[in-house]
Amino acid sequence: MKTFSLLFRATLLAAAIAATATTPALAKDPNVLRLGIDPSYPPMDVKMPDGHVTGFDVDLADEICRRIAMHCEWVEMEFSGVIPALQARKIDAIVSSMAITEKRMQQIAFSTKLFQFKSRLIARTGTPLTVSAEGLRGKRIGVQSGTQFETYVQKNWQPGGAEVVAYQSQEGVFDDLIAGRLDAALLGSVEADNGFLKTPKGKGFGFIGGPLEMGDHGTGIGLRKEDVALKDKIDHAIAAMRADGTYQKIAAKYFDFDVYGS
């Protein structure tokens, strides 16, 4: 009886494993595009009180999904984890204001450009800072981990004595800047001007120095290199949105200037 019971259990286990391996219901829905996003970067990527995500990135992606006949499914995660998640096939694309850089292009592919902004340093108004390696010596500069801003500070200011302080979220950067644990923060000028600096928390802070050139190729949608067909569809959708004025209408909801750049 005991032998029979063990054999019976083994048979059931084998059947369960086989069913798990072959059940079509567990396969990804081909009509769903899972998009990785860090919704902590207004006005580009924002999580609303009711839990849904919105922002310029989100509106653009929703329109792209509509045009390629797919449904956007937003997957929230820290920015530093989006490329590993894409490579592990936990998501299908990255839509999170990701700059197209030479380093990232070695790892993943990108759509054609979505927009292009300059970057700037922000600090408490009246802070006597000079935006240079010498002027920032001994200063604590906050950046979001995994961004081009972190790379820029490490390359240009850290060798001169600036301290790079990286955070998992942009909110963490702002919180420590407000608390006085940072001397300044580096981020996109539009995200700063249209986001943090226009909030009650941003009162008393402003830009230090002029726009900085990061050396990127604008911002795009991150994709796996092998997903050539998907990239082609997305690129065509972006071009069509630019041509028929839809892109400009979406941008006008957030900005009063040309965000696409030259």
Task: Report each predicted region and the residues it spans.
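Ligand-binding cleft/hinge of the Venus flytrap
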Residues: 47, 61-70, 133, 149-168, ...
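Extracytoplasmic small-molecule ligand-binding "clamshell" domains
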Residues: 27-97, 106, 244, 253, ...
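Flexible hinge/capping segments at coil-to-helix
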Residues: 27, 123-141
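Periplasmic-binding protein-like
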Residues: 39, 115-123, 197-236, 255-262
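Short loop->beta-strand "edge-of-pocket" segments that line small-molecule binding or catalytic clefts
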Residues: 33-37, 133-147
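Ligand-binding clefts/hinges and TM-proximal coupling segments of bilobed small-molecule sensing domains
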Residues: 71, 148-165, 204-206, 236-262
